[in-house]
Amino acid sequence: EWTPDSKTAVATMGADDFRANEQSVTLPAADVLTIEFTDEDGKTTVLKEGLKVLKGEVVDGTFMSAKALDAFLAEQVKRAKEEGILFSAHLKATMMKVSDPVIFGHVVKAYFSELFEKYGEQLAAAGLSANNGLAAIEGGLDKLDAETAEGVRAAIAAAYENGPDVAMVNSAKGITNLHVPSDVIVDASMPAMIRTSGRMWNKDDQTQDTLAVIPDSSYAGVYQAVIDDCKANGAYDPTTMGTVPNVGLMAQKAEEYGSHDKTFIMDAAGTVAVKNSAGETLLSHEVEAGDIWRACQTKDVPVRDWVKLAVTRARASLSLIHIS
Protein backbone atom coordinates (compact mmCIF):
# COMPACT_ATOMS: atom_id res chain seq x y z
CA GLU A 1 0.00 0.00 0.00
CA TRP A 2 1.17 3.50 -0.83
CA THR A 3 1.22 6.19 1.84
CA PRO A 4 1.54 9.99 1.47
CA ASP A 5 4.70 9.96 3.61
CA SER A 6 6.60 7.61 1.26
CA LYS A 7 10.09 8.97 0.55
CA THR A 8 10.32 7.20 -2.80
CA ALA A 9 11.14 9.52 -5.69
CA VAL A 10 12.63 9.70 -9.16
CA ALA A 11 15.81 11.69 -9.72
CA THR A 12 16.63 12.87 -13.24
CA MET A 13 19.02 15.37 -14.80
CA GLY A 14 16.53 17.61 -16.62
CA ALA A 15 19.37 19.59 -18.21
CA ASP A 16 22.45 18.70 -20.25
CA ASP A 17 20.94 15.28 -21.03
CA PHE A 18 19.67 13.64 -24.22
CA ARG A 19 16.22 15.23 -23.92
CA ALA A 20 17.49 18.73 -23.17
CA ASN A 21 20.09 18.84 -25.94
CA GLU A 22 18.11 17.27 -28.77
CA GLN A 23 17.97 18.93 -32.18
CA SER A 24 16.04 17.49 -35.12
CA VAL A 25 15.39 18.10 -38.79
CA THR A 26 12.93 16.66 -41.32
CA LEU A 27 14.66 15.96 -44.63
CA PRO A 28 13.04 17.70 -47.62
CA ALA A 29 14.49 15.14 -50.05
CA ALA A 30 16.46 11.91 -50.12
CA ASP A 31 20.10 12.52 -49.26
CA VAL A 32 23.30 11.03 -47.89
CA LEU A 33 24.53 12.48 -44.60
CA THR A 34 27.87 12.60 -42.83
CA ILE A 35 28.60 12.98 -39.11
CA GLU A 36 31.82 14.90 -38.42
CA PHE A 37 33.78 15.90 -35.34
CA THR A 38 35.98 18.99 -35.39
CA ASP A 39 38.29 19.44 -32.42
CA GLU A 40 39.32 22.77 -30.90
CA ASP A 41 42.41 22.86 -33.13
CA GLY A 42 40.25 22.66 -36.25
CA LYS A 43 41.05 19.05 -37.14
CA THR A 44 38.02 17.27 -38.59
CA THR A 45 37.34 13.54 -38.26
CA VAL A 46 34.51 11.67 -39.98
CA LEU A 47 32.56 9.70 -37.38
CA LYS A 48 30.00 8.26 -39.80
CA GLU A 49 29.56 8.58 -43.54
CA GLY A 50 27.20 7.23 -46.17
CA LEU A 51 24.15 7.75 -43.96
CA LYS A 52 21.28 7.36 -46.42
CA VAL A 53 18.02 9.14 -45.62
CA LEU A 54 14.67 9.37 -47.38
CA LYS A 55 12.38 12.29 -48.08
CA GLY A 56 10.34 13.07 -44.96
CA GLU A 57 12.75 11.24 -42.67
CA VAL A 58 13.40 12.77 -39.26
CA VAL A 59 17.03 12.90 -38.14
CA ASP A 60 17.94 14.03 -34.66
CA GLY A 61 21.13 14.49 -32.73
CA THR A 62 21.79 15.02 -29.04
CA PHE A 63 24.31 14.43 -26.28
CA MET A 64 24.61 13.88 -22.55
CA SER A 65 27.21 15.95 -20.75
CA ALA A 66 29.59 13.73 -18.77
CA LYS A 67 30.46 16.59 -16.43
CA ALA A 68 26.79 17.33 -15.69
CA LEU A 69 26.05 13.61 -15.30
CA ASP A 70 28.81 13.19 -12.72
CA ALA A 71 27.65 16.23 -10.73
CA PHE A 72 24.06 14.97 -10.80
CA LEU A 73 25.03 11.46 -9.66
CA ALA A 74 27.21 12.72 -6.81
CA GLU A 75 24.25 14.75 -5.57
CA GLN A 76 21.91 11.75 -5.72
CA VAL A 77 24.29 9.53 -3.74
CA LYS A 78 24.38 12.26 -1.09
CA ARG A 79 20.60 12.69 -1.19
CA ALA A 80 19.86 8.98 -0.75
CA LYS A 81 22.20 8.88 2.26
CA GLU A 82 20.66 11.96 3.87
CA GLU A 83 17.09 10.74 3.35
CA GLY A 84 17.81 7.19 4.49
CA ILE A 85 16.47 5.59 1.33
CA LEU A 86 17.89 3.07 -1.12
CA PHE A 87 20.04 4.24 -4.01
CA SER A 88 19.12 2.60 -7.32
CA ALA A 89 19.86 3.23 -10.99
CA HIS A 90 17.43 2.38 -13.79
CA LEU A 91 18.76 2.29 -17.36
CA LYS A 92 18.37 0.38 -20.65
CA ALA A 93 21.78 -1.26 -20.89
CA THR A 94 20.53 -4.11 -23.07
CA MET A 95 18.58 -2.08 -25.63
CA MET A 96 20.86 0.98 -25.50
CA LYS A 97 23.98 -1.14 -25.68
CA VAL A 98 26.45 1.64 -26.49
CA SER A 99 25.33 4.60 -24.38
CA ASP A 100 23.80 3.06 -21.27
CA PRO A 101 26.68 0.83 -20.14
CA VAL A 102 28.78 4.01 -20.19
CA ILE A 103 26.16 5.85 -18.13
CA PHE A 104 26.08 2.85 -15.78
CA GLY A 105 29.84 3.17 -15.41
CA HIS A 106 29.41 6.77 -14.32
CA VAL A 107 26.88 5.59 -11.70
CA VAL A 108 29.30 2.97 -10.36
CA LYS A 109 32.09 5.55 -10.19
CA ALA A 110 29.83 8.02 -8.39
CA TYR A 111 28.89 5.56 -5.67
CA PHE A 112 32.42 4.18 -5.30
CA SER A 113 34.07 7.57 -5.85
CA GLU A 114 36.93 7.08 -3.39
CA LEU A 115 37.67 3.66 -4.87
CA PHE A 116 38.17 5.12 -8.33
CA GLU A 117 40.03 8.17 -7.07
CA LYS A 118 42.58 5.90 -5.41
CA TYR A 119 42.68 2.84 -7.67
CA GLY A 120 41.15 4.01 -10.95
CA GLU A 121 44.40 3.88 -12.90
CA GLN A 122 45.30 0.41 -11.64
CA LEU A 123 41.83 -0.91 -12.45
CA ALA A 124 41.96 0.56 -15.96
CA ALA A 125 45.42 -0.88 -16.55
CA ALA A 126 44.07 -4.30 -15.59
CA GLY A 127 41.17 -3.92 -18.04
CA LEU A 128 38.58 -3.59 -15.28
CA SER A 129 35.92 -1.07 -16.29
CA ALA A 130 33.11 0.41 -14.23
CA ASN A 131 30.97 0.11 -17.36
CA ASN A 132 30.80 -3.65 -16.77
CA GLY A 133 29.64 -3.27 -13.18
CA LEU A 134 30.98 -4.10 -9.76
CA ALA A 135 30.76 -7.85 -10.37
CA ALA A 136 33.31 -7.64 -13.19
CA ILE A 137 35.66 -5.60 -11.01
CA GLU A 138 35.40 -7.96 -8.06
CA GLY A 139 35.80 -10.92 -10.39
CA GLY A 140 38.97 -9.49 -11.91
CA LEU A 141 40.89 -8.62 -8.76
CA ASP A 142 43.28 -11.50 -9.44
CA LYS A 143 44.70 -9.31 -12.22
CA LEU A 144 46.01 -6.92 -9.56
CA ASP A 145 48.82 -7.44 -7.09
CA ALA A 146 47.70 -8.71 -3.69
CA GLU A 147 48.14 -5.40 -1.89
CA THR A 148 46.17 -3.42 -4.47
CA ALA A 149 43.43 -6.05 -4.60
CA GLU A 150 43.06 -5.89 -0.83
CA GLY A 151 42.93 -2.10 -1.01
CA VAL A 152 40.16 -2.28 -3.60
CA ARG A 153 38.15 -4.65 -1.41
CA ALA A 154 38.57 -2.31 1.55
CA ALA A 155 37.48 0.70 -0.53
CA ILE A 156 34.37 -1.14 -1.70
CA ALA A 157 33.50 -2.06 1.89
CA ALA A 158 34.06 1.55 3.00
CA ALA A 159 31.74 2.85 0.27
CA TYR A 160 28.97 0.56 1.47
CA GLU A 161 29.61 1.61 5.07
CA ASN A 162 29.67 5.35 4.42
CA GLY A 163 27.25 5.64 1.52
CA PRO A 164 23.53 5.01 1.18
CA ASP A 165 22.23 1.45 1.10
CA VAL A 166 21.97 0.14 -2.45
CA ALA A 167 18.90 -1.60 -3.89
CA MET A 168 19.50 -5.32 -4.23
CA VAL A 169 18.94 -7.66 -7.15
CA ASN A 170 19.58 -10.69 -4.94
CA SER A 171 19.92 -9.97 -1.22
CA ALA A 172 20.91 -13.55 -0.35
CA LYS A 173 23.86 -13.48 -2.76
CA GLY A 174 24.81 -9.86 -2.09
CA ILE A 175 24.16 -8.80 -5.67
CA THR A 176 23.36 -5.10 -5.80
CA ASN A 177 21.84 -2.82 -8.40
CA LEU A 178 25.42 -1.84 -9.32
CA HIS A 179 26.83 -5.31 -9.97
CA VAL A 180 25.70 -5.92 -13.57
CA PRO A 181 24.52 -3.24 -16.07
CA SER A 182 21.74 -5.41 -17.51
CA ASP A 183 20.29 -6.64 -14.21
CA VAL A 184 17.98 -3.64 -13.75
CA ILE A 185 16.13 -2.47 -16.88
CA VAL A 186 13.94 0.60 -16.40
CA ASP A 187 10.95 -0.69 -18.42
CA ALA A 188 10.58 -3.61 -16.01
CA SER A 189 12.21 -2.36 -12.81
CA MET A 190 10.19 0.82 -12.35
CA PRO A 191 6.73 -0.79 -12.78
CA ALA A 192 7.85 -3.55 -10.39
CA MET A 193 8.95 -0.97 -7.83
CA ILE A 194 5.69 0.95 -8.16
CA ARG A 195 3.69 -2.26 -7.65
CA THR A 196 5.58 -2.86 -4.38
CA SER A 197 4.59 0.49 -2.87
CA GLY A 198 7.60 2.28 -4.33
CA ARG A 199 10.02 0.04 -2.53
CA MET A 200 12.93 -2.15 -3.52
CA TRP A 201 14.81 -4.82 -1.56
CA ASN A 202 17.67 -3.87 0.76
CA LYS A 203 20.64 -5.92 1.99
CA ASP A 204 18.56 -7.30 4.87
CA ASP A 205 15.98 -8.68 2.40
CA GLN A 206 13.43 -6.08 3.48
CA THR A 207 11.62 -3.58 1.27
CA GLN A 208 12.59 0.06 1.65
CA ASP A 209 11.70 3.43 0.10
CA THR A 210 13.92 4.11 -2.87
CA LEU A 211 15.52 6.90 -4.87
CA ALA A 212 15.18 5.79 -8.49
CA VAL A 213 17.98 7.44 -10.46
CA ILE A 214 17.05 7.75 -14.14
CA PRO A 215 19.66 10.16 -15.56
CA ASP A 216 18.02 10.99 -18.90
CA SER A 217 14.78 12.91 -18.42
CA SER A 218 13.23 11.60 -21.66
CA TYR A 219 11.20 8.96 -19.84
CA ALA A 220 11.73 9.76 -16.16
CA GLY A 221 8.75 12.08 -15.84
CA VAL A 222 6.06 9.46 -16.37
CA TYR A 223 7.33 7.43 -13.41
CA GLN A 224 7.46 10.45 -11.08
CA ALA A 225 3.90 11.35 -12.12
CA VAL A 226 2.68 7.84 -11.26
CA ILE A 227 4.52 7.90 -7.93
CA ASP A 228 3.00 11.28 -7.04
CA ASP A 229 -0.46 9.96 -7.93
CA CYS A 230 0.00 6.80 -5.87
CA LYS A 231 1.16 8.82 -2.87
CA ALA A 232 -1.93 11.01 -3.12
CA ASN A 233 -4.56 8.43 -4.09
CA GLY A 234 -3.18 4.99 -3.26
CA ALA A 235 -1.97 2.04 -5.32
CA TYR A 236 -3.33 1.41 -8.79
CA ASP A 237 -5.84 -1.40 -9.23
CA PRO A 238 -6.11 -2.52 -12.88
CA THR A 239 -9.29 -4.49 -12.08
CA THR A 240 -11.15 -1.24 -11.41
CA MET A 241 -9.24 1.36 -13.42
CA GLY A 242 -8.45 -0.71 -16.51
CA THR A 243 -5.24 -0.62 -18.52
CA VAL A 244 -3.70 1.54 -21.23
CA PRO A 245 -1.78 -0.38 -23.92
CA ASN A 246 1.42 1.23 -25.18
CA VAL A 247 2.22 1.43 -28.88
CA GLY A 248 5.89 2.26 -29.34
CA LEU A 249 7.66 3.62 -32.41
CA MET A 250 10.41 1.09 -33.17
CA ALA A 251 9.94 -0.03 -36.78
CA GLN A 252 12.89 0.23 -39.18
CA LYS A 253 15.23 1.11 -36.28
CA ALA A 254 13.28 4.25 -35.45
CA GLU A 255 14.42 6.74 -32.85
CA GLU A 256 16.98 5.61 -30.26
CA TYR A 257 16.50 1.94 -31.18
CA GLY A 258 18.64 2.49 -34.26
CA SER A 259 21.18 4.82 -32.69
CA HIS A 260 23.85 2.25 -31.80
CA ASP A 261 25.98 2.80 -34.91
CA LYS A 262 25.62 6.57 -34.51
CA THR A 263 26.58 6.82 -30.83
CA PHE A 264 30.03 8.11 -29.89
CA ILE A 265 31.89 8.70 -26.64
CA MET A 266 33.86 11.85 -27.28
CA ASP A 267 37.63 11.71 -26.83
CA ALA A 268 38.09 15.48 -26.86
CA ALA A 269 36.25 18.80 -26.83
CA GLY A 270 34.96 20.23 -30.09
CA THR A 271 31.92 20.24 -32.35
CA VAL A 272 29.89 17.34 -33.71
CA ALA A 273 27.94 18.20 -36.85
CA VAL A 274 25.55 16.35 -39.14
CA LYS A 275 25.97 17.53 -42.72
CA ASN A 276 24.10 16.84 -45.95
CA SER A 277 25.68 15.93 -49.29
CA ALA A 278 26.05 19.62 -50.13
CA GLY A 279 28.17 20.13 -47.02
CA GLU A 280 25.49 22.12 -45.22
CA THR A 281 25.25 21.68 -41.45
CA LEU A 282 21.86 20.33 -40.37
CA LEU A 283 22.61 19.80 -36.67
CA SER A 284 25.56 20.63 -34.43
CA HIS A 285 26.58 20.40 -30.78
CA GLU A 286 29.50 21.73 -28.76
CA VAL A 287 30.81 18.77 -26.76
CA GLU A 288 33.52 18.00 -24.21
CA ALA A 289 35.66 14.91 -23.64
CA GLY A 290 33.59 12.07 -22.21
CA ASP A 291 30.26 13.36 -23.49
CA ILE A 292 27.93 10.80 -25.07
CA TRP A 293 26.69 11.99 -28.47
CA ARG A 294 24.15 10.13 -30.57
CA ALA A 295 21.99 10.50 -33.66
CA CYS A 296 18.71 8.79 -34.51
CA GLN A 297 16.68 8.27 -37.67
CA THR A 298 12.92 7.92 -37.98
CA LYS A 299 11.49 7.24 -41.41
CA ASP A 300 8.18 8.75 -42.51
CA VAL A 301 6.36 5.45 -43.18
CA PRO A 302 6.89 3.97 -39.69
CA VAL A 303 5.51 7.17 -38.15
CA ARG A 304 2.36 6.94 -40.27
CA ASP A 305 1.97 3.21 -39.56
CA TRP A 306 2.57 3.81 -35.85
CA VAL A 307 -0.26 6.32 -35.54
CA LYS A 308 -2.54 4.16 -37.71
CA LEU A 309 -1.83 1.11 -35.54
CA ALA A 310 -2.60 3.07 -32.38
CA VAL A 311 -5.93 4.31 -33.75
CA THR A 312 -6.87 0.82 -35.00
CA ARG A 313 -6.09 -0.78 -31.64
CA ALA A 314 -7.99 1.90 -29.75
CA ARG A 315 -11.08 1.36 -31.87
CA ALA A 316 -10.87 -2.43 -31.62
CA SER A 317 -10.39 -2.48 -27.85
CA LEU A 318 -12.51 0.59 -27.07
CA SER A 319 -9.70 1.79 -24.83
CA LEU A 320 -7.22 4.60 -24.47
CA ILE A 321 -3.89 4.05 -26.20
CA HIS A 322 -0.55 5.54 -25.15
CA ILE A 323 1.84 6.14 -28.03
CA SER A 324 5.53 6.68 -27.31
Task: Kindly give the residue locations of the regions a language model identified.
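Extended, well-ordered protein cores
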Residues: 1-105, 114-319
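Conserved small/polar residues in nucleotide/adenosyl-binding loops
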Residues: 321-323
